[in-house]
UniProtKB/Swiss-Prot annotation:
<dbReference type="InterPro" id="IPR056749">
    <property type="entry name" value="Citrate_synth_N"/>
</dbReference>
<keyword id="KW-0808">Transferase</keyword>
<feature type="modified residue" description="Phosphoserine">
    <location>
        <position position="451"/>
    </location>
</feature>
<dbReference type="Pfam" id="PF02629">
    <property type="entry name" value="CoA_binding"/>
</dbReference>
<keyword id="KW-0597">Phosphoprotein</keyword>
<dbReference type="GO" id="GO:0006107">
    <property type="term" value="P:oxaloacetate metabolic process"/>
</dbReference>
<feature type="modified residue" description="N6-acetyllysine; alternate">
    <location>
        <position position="536"/>
    </location>
</feature>
<feature type="modified residue" description="Phosphoserine">
    <location>
        <position position="653"/>
    </location>
</feature>
<feature type="cross-link" description="Glycyl lysine isopeptide (Lys-Gly) (interchain with G-Cter in ubiquitin); alternate">
    <location>
        <position position="536"/>
    </location>
</feature>
<keyword id="KW-0547">Nucleotide-binding</keyword>
<feature type="modified residue" description="Phosphothreonine">
    <location>
        <position position="629"/>
    </location>
</feature>
<keyword id="KW-1017">Isopeptide bond</keyword>
<feature type="modified residue" description="Phosphoserine">
    <location>
        <position position="263"/>
    </location>
</feature>
<dbReference type="GO" id="GO:0005829">
    <property type="term" value="C:cytosol"/>
</dbReference>
<dbReference type="Pfam" id="PF16114">
    <property type="entry name" value="Citrate_bind"/>
</dbReference>
<dbReference type="InterPro" id="IPR017866">
    <property type="entry name" value="Succ-CoA_synthase_bsu_CS"/>
</dbReference>
<feature type="modified residue" description="Phosphoserine; by PKA and PKB/AKT1 or PKB/AKT2 or BCKDK">
    <location>
        <position position="455"/>
    </location>
</feature>
Length: 1091
């Protein structure tokens, strides 16, 4: 959400820190917070003024009218404060319908003053600007300030000066206080703007001869401005409204939400409740809550929440397990219900999100059965059939009753089923599979005739006169038609999937040319990106600079802005500098409201229509679609969005607009145009902007509006009907009717979905619309029926003549999507069995990386997983690590190190120098480790005794690999071998091959003392013993690892550490190019050549 309430303490702290005014503000930072855990001795140490001044104490928990409720203790000593707090601190209180515990109080100095010194000041944001209210009589009895107070609107980008304040606001203020008040209000307004407040009320503001005192303060800030105000705000806290506790689970989901590009929301209403929801989509989540409350479930509704914006499988798992954990804590005598609902997704892969939920259900199957939980599922969107299949499957395998429905079932029908108001069908009708839409069912390869590109009703627009003649449209700068079959757009952002979706839509609508002319992406140079137009490959240019894109594509008049919330404002402002652009869609959610208002102001000046922010966009069947609107091609075809119908709609929610596509296609001849204006408080274009366009468009015969709690935009529709400006039938339903039934305020998924006054509630708006003559259903459940009855009435009157359906062209399916749907298979070019990086976390041979660290497996354990695909015993891991340590380096003289040093001194980079050293490893250097293992294993396994083996090798004239050392001998042992031998003898369960090799060593050293078992030989034979005897491998597996050269890997990996060390050493010593000295080279030339 956007506007969030902050505590009085936070508001005052920010104000005292950052307000800039000539008025003398008294008692700065003089406040002390008291909670049930407060240590009074410590509090007095921090705030010594508590002992010397008269005090005021009050709860700081977003409670309005505390004075009237007797929740303010005035003019008390410290002991008096303690006595006053005793029956209140930590005790339950009732405020209106809300019950909650009082556990956060504020103590401040008492300010003696007269009633004449109390004033009221309030600043709040609206679409047009910020209203400043002032009343010369403040305090608890201020009454209806809207009616009494002086009011001044400060427009967007305008400044408030002291002269305006005196002239418009301080009309009735005492003359001697006007200067002080004007300076304070001016500073307060600048502070309010700079720190992105949306509401700031001080009542009373006391002005005495000593200065200004801020007694009581209430405030809201725009939480989305955190990235701008972080330095000044610090770690700001947003307390829950009174009557609702702050739960750690809510904080956990809020933290997940903050770290994700997706949206994840959770509000606990009644943790003991029977009905729980897990709904996809900001709009759909409100509709489900409405329906539950309408059907009598308000007291049993446990939570409000939503997930949207394509969360990953892991994020959905984390969200789902949080809800399942909460709902399986307390039993309910009637069992519990979980509603996993959602509208038809535009771009979220339903199967991926459902797999996360399925994982959570499997993890909690025991508690779910114990608590007698029944689950109802309804969803649509990309790959929804697979999602529903896995959901149904988990019900069968776990024994949990799970009822699964798709787009063939009305979105909220499952609520009626869950609450026993409608029967649960045994076999719901199944929708056609994705593939059935995209693959030509007849088998014919010919492209069908072009589909119709105008509704039949549009071609007869002049023949059938409307029932009433509409008043002429007011002259406007903005066009009634935003999109046509020839509309061209630029897409800001590297959104290849959305662009391909637009091109597929264009193709299936039989457009002559693609609707995307170019893309703008500032983070790469100019280039071309490959896309498909039907089965053909085409190139679309990508520009670094917007100016270049505009210059080269003057035919473009639409920009689709996929910039992030941080970049969306600047990129949209830049776009509006180009007169050719008439429509801009802003997809990003979370743009601060103050910045959105600046965009709206500039757009109005330029005559530009903005759709969004926080939207999926809009669609005009047969002509143009914005980004991901309408979902994937299967939904476009199922909802008949490839040709126009007669019904135009406007909604706030992107997901609900897709649901409207589905409802309208099932109950009428289809959609003519649909726009989702976005969920923010100040959408760029309003309901009425689009409703008036539809009124002036001959092809539109009826209008559907899906309104929402918050704002007053829907009342303009009532006014339009009364004034005769709107004459076409309008069907409207405002979602959010459940809000009036909750005891405490709930912020819904959309930033603008919050009623600040009675007229903004969904119930009030639905009533007013009905009285104005709009067709209003009794609930969202009946919306489809009302639309159908209005449509059938228009058909009966002849205003709409349904046209004959023409099949659309067949569009080839993307390979990657066909594979995801399981429609095709192809042999993979590569196979791997050791590592998987595709999920939420890295997996080594089946073990998540978090487990690797939790178990403290170390380098040896990781090698066990990556090299041998299994967990090795601890001593084996330690042995591997010891081998790496002892093989790490053997000085600069050996061939590998020598090569590395020469390369480093020749100025080569790290990788080149390292590889030059590694390339020397072979039979003569390092490779003895592998060869020794094979040679000793063969001898031992053949059953010949050590003496026989030595004699055999001597007779064949072969060296025994792993025996012998240039420097070390039986009298000067190699300490590396000694360390390894001690460890192996102490920890290995058996060492038959090592014992054999040591017997061989006795024979060889009796002939020559330096023919010892060297470090290569020791590691080789000991490693074979480890593989054969640790219990983790079969004999065949152990032999295979020796045969494929796994042991050489130990030397290569270990020695790489030393080679890198030599490289860094040479660079650090700044050694120059190496040239070998002549006196160390013996020049032996052929004699006949030297003559």
């Amino acid at each position: 959400m956007s506007a969030k309430a902050i505590s009085e303490q936070t508001g005052k702290e920010l104000l005292y820190k950052y307000i800039c005014t000539t008025s003398a503000i008294q008692n700065r930072f003089k406040y002390a917070r008291v909670t049930p855990d407060t240590d009074w001795a410590h509090l007095l140490q921090d705030h010594p003024w508590l002992l010397s001044q008269s005090l005021v104490v009050k709860p700081d928990q977003l409670i309005k009218r505390r004075g009237k409720l007797g929740l303010v203790g005035v003019n008390l000593s410290l002991d008096g404060v303690k006595s006053w707090l005793k029956p209140r601190l930590g005790h339950e209180a009732t405020v209106g319908k809300a019950k909650g515990f009082l556990k956060n109080f504020l103590i401040e100095p008492f300010v003696p003053h007269s009633q004449a010194e109390e004033f009221y000041v309030c600043i709040y944001a609206t679409r047009e600007g910020d209203y400043v209210l002032f009343h010369h009589e403040g305090g608890v009895d201020v009454g209806d300030v809207d009616a009494k107070a002086q009011k001044l609107l400060v427009g967007v980008d305008e400044k408030l000066n002291t002269e305006d304040i005196k002239r418009h606001l301080l009309v009735h203020a005492p003359e001697d206080k006007k200067e002080v008040l004007a300076s304070f209000i001016s500073g307060l307004f600048n502070f309010y703007e700079d720190l992105y407040f949306t509401y700031l009320e001080i009542n009373p503001l006391v002005v005495t001869k000593d200065g200004v005192y801020i007694l009581d303060l209430a405030a809201k800030v725009d939480a989305t401005a955190d990235y701008i105000c972080k330095v000044k705000w610090g770690d700001i806290e947003f307390p829950p409204p009174f009557g609702r506790e702050a739960y750690p689970e809510e904080a956990y989901i809020a933290d997940l939400d903050a770290k994700s590009g997706a949206s994840l929301k959770l509000t606990l209403l009644n943790p003991k409740g029977r009905i729980w929801t897990m709904v996809a989509g900001g709009g759909a989540s409100v509709v489900y809550s409405d329906t539950i409350c309408d059907l009598g479930g308000v007291n049993e509704l446990a939570n409000y929440g939503e997930y949207s914006g394509a969360p990953s499988e892991q994020q959905t798992y984390d969200y789902a397990k949080t809800i399942l954990s909460l709902m399986t804590r307390e039993k309910h005598p009637e069992g519990k219900i979980l509603i996993i609902g959602g509208s038809i997704a535009n771009f979220t892969n339903v199967a991926a999100t459902f797999k996360g939920i399925v994982r959570a259900i499997r993890d909690y199957q025991g508690p779910l059965k114990e608590h007698e939980v029944t689950i109802f599922v309804r969803r649509g969107g990309p790959n929804y059939q697979e999602g529903l299949r896995v959901m149904g499957e988990v019900g069968k395998t776990t024994g949990i009753p799970i009822h699964v429905f798709g787009t063939e079932t009305h979105m909220t029908a499952i609520v009626g089923m869950a609450l026993g108001h409608r029967p649960i069908p045994n076999q719901p009708p199944t929708a056609a599979h994705t593939a059935n839409f995209l693959l030509n069912a007849s088998g014919s390869t010919s492209t069908p005739a072009p589909s119709r590109t105008a509704s039949f009703s549009e071609s007869r627009a002049d023949e059938v006169a409307p029932a009433k003649k509409a008043k002429p449209a007011m002259p406007q700068g903005k066009s009634a038609t935003l999109f046509s079959r020839h509309t061209k757009a630029i897409v800001w952002g590297m959104q290849t999937r959305a662009v391909q979706g637009m091109l597929d839509f264009d193709y299936v609508c039989s457009r002559d040319e693609p609707s995307v002319a170019a893309m703008v992406y500032p983070f790469t140079g100019d280039h071309k990106q490959k896309f498909y137009w039907g089965h053909k490959e085409i190139l679309i240019p990508v520009f670094k600079n917007m100016a270049d894109a505009m210059k080269k594509h003057p035919e473009v008049d639409v920009l689709i802005n996929f910039a992030s919330l941080r970049s969306a404002y600047d990129s949209t402002m830049e776009t509006m500098n180009y007169a050719q652009i008439r429509t801009i869609a802003i997809i990003a959610e979370g743009i601060p409201e103050a910045l959105t208002r600046k965009l709206i102001k500039k757009a109005d000046q330029k005559g530009v229509t903005i759709i969004g922010p926080a939207t999926v966009g809009g669609i005009k069947p047969g002509c143009f679609k914005i980004g991901n609107t309408g979902g994937m091609l299967d939904n476009i075809l199922a909802s008949k969005l490839y040709r126009p119908g007669s019904v135009a709609y406007v909604s706030r929610s992107g997901g609900m607009s897709n649901e409207l596509n589905n409802i309208i296609s099932r109950t009428t001849d289809g959609v003519y145009e649909g726009v989702a204006i976005g969920g923010d408080r100040y959408p760029g274009s309003t309901f009425m902007d689009h409703v008036l366009r539809y009124q002036d468009t001959p092809g539109v015969k009826m209008i559907v509006v899906l309104g929402e709690i918050g704002g007053t935009e829907e009342y303009k529709i009532c006014r339009g009907i009364k004034e005769g400006r709107l004459t076409k039938p309008v069907v409207c339903w405002c979602i959010g009717t459940c809000a009036t039934m909750f005891s405490s305020e709930v912020q819904f998924g959309h930033a603008g979905a919050c009623a600040n006054q009675a007229s903004e509630t969904a119930v009030a708006k639905n009533q007013a619309l009905k009285e104005a003559g709009v067709f209003v259903p009794r609930s969202f459940d009946e919306l489809g029926e009302i639309i159908q009855s209005v449509y059938e009435d228009l058909v009966a009157k002849g205003a709409i003549v349904p046209a004959q359906e023409v099949p659309p062209p067949t569009v080839p399916m993307d390979y990657s999507w066909a594979r995801e749907l399981g429609l095709i298979r192809k042999p993979a070019s590569f196979m791997t069995s050791i590592c998987d990086e595709r999920g939420q976390e890295l997996i080594y041979a089946g073990m998540p990386i978090t487990e690797v660290f939790k178990e403290e497996m170390g380098i040896g354990g990781v090698l066990g997983l990556l090299w041998f695909q299994r967990r090795l015993p601890k001593y084996s891991c330690q042995f591997i690590e010891m081998c790496l340590m002892v093989t790490a380096d053997h000085g600069p003289a050996v061939s590998g190190a020598h090569n590395t040093i020469i390369c480093a001194r020749a100025g080569k980079d790290l990788v080149s120098s390292l590889t030059s050293g590694l390339l020397t490893i072979g039979d003569r250097f390092g490779g003895a480790l592998d060869a020794a293992a094979k040679m000793f294993s063969k001898a031992f396994d053949s059953g010949i005794i050590p003496m026989e083996f030595v004699n055999k090798m001597k007779k064949e004239g072969k060296l025994i690999m792993g025996i012998g050392h240039r420097v070390k001998s039986i009298n000067n042992p190699d300490m590396r071998v000694q360390i390894l031998k001690d460890f192996v003898k102490q920890h290995f369960p058996a060492t038959p091959l090592l014992d054999y090799a040591l017997e061989v060593e006795k024979i060889t050293t009796s002939k020559k003392p330096n023919l010892i078992l060297n470090v290569d030989g020791f590691i080789g034979v000991a490693f074979v013993d480890m593989l054969r005897n640790c219990g983790s491998f079969t004999r065949e597996e152990a032999d295979e690892y020796v045969d494929i050269g796994a042991l050489n890997g130990i030397f290569v990996l270990g020695r790489s550490m030393g080679f890198i060390g030599h490289y860094l050493d040479q660079k650090r010593l700044k050694q120059g190019l190496y040239r070998h000295p002549w006196d160390d080279i013996s020049y032996v030339l052929p004699e006949h050549m030297s003559m």
